[in-house]
């Protein structure tokens, strides 16, 4: 019987398997940031160990970095804990070393799941880990990538391996093509809406089908980024010419003969025709419309042309209770059209949607509409995912498009995705966000998050409420 893409990468990296299925898995790339690494470095130090393979580490500061005040340098980091975590990372990498380190305010600094791929740290066939749940992003390259906890960060540093049990295989196919105005973010939100946030639990998901193949590498990263929101620890897309072209000539990519050898191997990284999947889910791309989450879980999502659901129509008592709780927190009434939901803030950024394609997508909407940010919007911020994305966007004049319309053009970082830095929602504020989680308090205590694509967020900023972006596509 043939093997799935997941099977192939797993088999290449298993060092040993116990009778109960617990395996020792070799790790190729270890991505490190300032929040989940300090305890691991200290644990290594106290145990008198050394990092096993320094050349596997690529590090950056992202979660705590401010997106304003860079002219003040490290003094611009107002929160003392955030400042300590960032400076501690600097000290740890200075002591231990790394294949590459992009410190706060450096040209290539940015969100770890953006700077990894753009620097060639993520390559097809790799096993990639990071102390961050959205490490699944890197699966877009045909890599087995997933988040790990802080104790596991230390374990990988010490041994270059991880204890793991193999997951089951799930295939999600998106047939046909999507309509203009429907993006990778809409595709993955529609998938989560279909299978739920627990649908992928215990699985590694391979995303396939014509609509997935048609996506750029940046779009595929968006899809794999949110595999974790579907319950799967990892998501994958098979390697093709787009994958190989993207990683070519990146700083950490192989060159010369090693490049040729790598490409020959990478071209084998796809599921065999007779591979077995434990579960297969199919969606029709033509049925997917721009998505908006209405509740407090990514699975609470509907097309922008729909209305807030009525809990009284839900027969399952547990689901009914969840809907009622979500509507109370979100301050929404059943039956309210999503198009009629007004927002207070707009956030375009995060490891889901802060790459150059996302910047272009949002700027194109702003330019086409030819309007300024609506008067009811308190803040509309655009936060590029890295210094390189920011630089490229400014070369293309995208920053001027945003600023002319009243958006704030910020420095790179995780920003308002999570309430761990200065960018956050105040209690009761409602946000159109291109991030990946809409849990209670995710963007700030009492804040209300609606997940959308960059195009949808940009349109909401200038209209003041959600609109169907297909009207302007």
From Swiss-Prot:
> Which residue windows are coiled coil?
none
The catalysed reaction is: (2R,3S)-3-isopropylmalate = (2S)-2-isopropylmalate
Q: How is the cofactor bound?
A: Binds 1 [4Fe-4S] cluster per subunit.
Single annotated GO MF? 4 iron, 4 sulfur cluster binding
Name the domain of life this protein comes from.
Bacteria
Write down the EC number: 4.2.1.33
Q: Which cofactor does it need?
A: [4Fe-4S] cluster
**Biological processes per GO annotation:** L-leucine biosynthetic process
Per its UniProt record, what InterPro entries does this chain match? 3-IsopropMal_deHydase_lsu (IPR004430), Acnase/IPM_dHydase_lsu_aba_1/3 (IPR015931), Acoase/IPM_deHydtase_lsu_aba (IPR001030), Aconitase_4Fe-4S_BS (IPR018136), Aconitase_4Fe-4S_dom (IPR036008), IPM_dehydratase_rel_enz (IPR050067), IPMI_cat (IPR033941)
Which residues are involved in binding [4Fe-4S] cluster?
351, 414, 417
Q: Give the metabolic or biological pathway.
A: Amino-acid biosynthesis; L-leucine biosynthesis; L-leucine from 3-methyl-2-oxobutanoate: step 2/4
What top-level class of enzyme does the UniProt entry assign?
lyase
Q: Does the keyword Metal-binding apply?
A: yes
Which UniProt key words apply to this protein?
A: 4Fe-4S, Amino-acid biosynthesis, Branched-chain amino acid biosynthesis, Iron, Iron-sulfur, Leucine biosynthesis, Lyase, Metal-binding
Q: SUPFAM superfamilies per the record?
A: Aconitase iron-sulfur domain (SSF53732)
Q: Which PANTHER family match?
A: 3-ISOPROPYLMALATE DEHYDRATASE, HOMOACONITASE, MITOCHONDRIAL-RELATED
Quote the subunit structure annotation: Heterodimer of LeuC and LeuD.
NCBIfam families linked to this entry: leuC, PRK05478.1, PRK12466.1
Family listed: Belongs to the aconitase/IPM isomerase family. LeuC type 1 subfamily.
User: What is this protein's function?
Assistant: Catalyzes the isomerization between 2-isopropylmalate and 3-isopropylmalate, via the formation of 2-isopropylmaleate.
Q: State the protein's name.
A: 3-isopropylmalate dehydratase large subunit
- Which gene specifies this protein's sequence? leuC
């Amino acid at each position: 019987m043939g093997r799935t893409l997941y099977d192939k990468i797993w088999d290449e990296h298993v060092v040993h398997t116990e009778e109960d299925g617990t395996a020792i898995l070799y790790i190729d790339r270890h991505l490190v940031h300032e929040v989940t690494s300090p305890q691991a470095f200290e644990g290594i130090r106290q145990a008198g160990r050394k990092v096993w393979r320094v050349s596997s580490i690529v590090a950056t500061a992202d979660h705590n970095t401010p997106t304003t005040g860079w002219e003040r340098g490290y003094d611009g980091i107002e929160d003392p804990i955030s400042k300590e975590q960032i400076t501690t990372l600097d000290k740890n990498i200075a002591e231990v070393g790394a294949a590459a380190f992009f410190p706060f305010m450096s040209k290539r600094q940015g969100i770890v799941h953006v700077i990894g791929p753009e620097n060639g740290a993520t390559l097809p066939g790799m096993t990639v880990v990071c102390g961050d749940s959205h490490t699944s992003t890197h699966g877009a390259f045909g890599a087995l990538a997933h988040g790990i906890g802080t104790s596991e960060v230390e374990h990988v540093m010490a041994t270059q391996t991880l204890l793991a049990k193999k997951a089951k295989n799930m295939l999600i196919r998106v047939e046909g093509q999507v309509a203009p105005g429907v993006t990778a973010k809409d595709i993955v939100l529609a998938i989560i809406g279909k299978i739920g946030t627990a649908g992928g639990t215990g699985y590694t998901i391979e995303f396939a089908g014509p609509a997935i193949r048609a996506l750029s590498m940046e779009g595929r990263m968006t899809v794999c980024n949110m595999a974790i929101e579907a319950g799967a620890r990892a998501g994958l897309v098979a390697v093709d010419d787009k994958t190989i072209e993207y990683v070519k000539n990146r700083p950490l990519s192989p060159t010369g003969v090693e490049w040729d050898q790598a490409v020959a191997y990478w071209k084998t990284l796809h599921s065999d025709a007779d591979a077995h999947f434990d579960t297969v889910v199919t969606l029709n791309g033509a049925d997917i419309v721009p998505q908006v989450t209405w509740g407090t879980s990514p699975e609470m999502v509907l097309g922008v042309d729909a209305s807030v659901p009525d809990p009284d129509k839900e027969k399952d008592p547990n689901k009914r209770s969840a809907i009622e709780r979500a509507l109370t927190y979100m301050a929404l009434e059943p039956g309210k059209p999503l198009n009629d939901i007004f927002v207070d803030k707009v956030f375009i950024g995060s490891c889901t949607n802060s790459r150059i394609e996302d910047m272009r997508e949002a700027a194109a909407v702003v330019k086409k509409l030819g309007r300024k940010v609506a008067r009811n919007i308190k803040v509309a911020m655009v936060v590029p995912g890295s210094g390189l994305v920011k630089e490229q966007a400014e070369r293309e004049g995208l920053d001027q498009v945003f600023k002319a319309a009243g958006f704030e053009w910020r420095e790179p970082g995780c920003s308002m995705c999570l309430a761990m830095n200065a960018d956050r929602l105040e209690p009761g504020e409602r946000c159109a966000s291109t991030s990946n989680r809409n849990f209670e308090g995710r963007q700030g205590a009492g804040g209300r998050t609606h997940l959308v694509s960059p195009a949808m967020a940009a349109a909401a900023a200038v209209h003041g409420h959600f609109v169907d972006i297909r009207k302007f596509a």
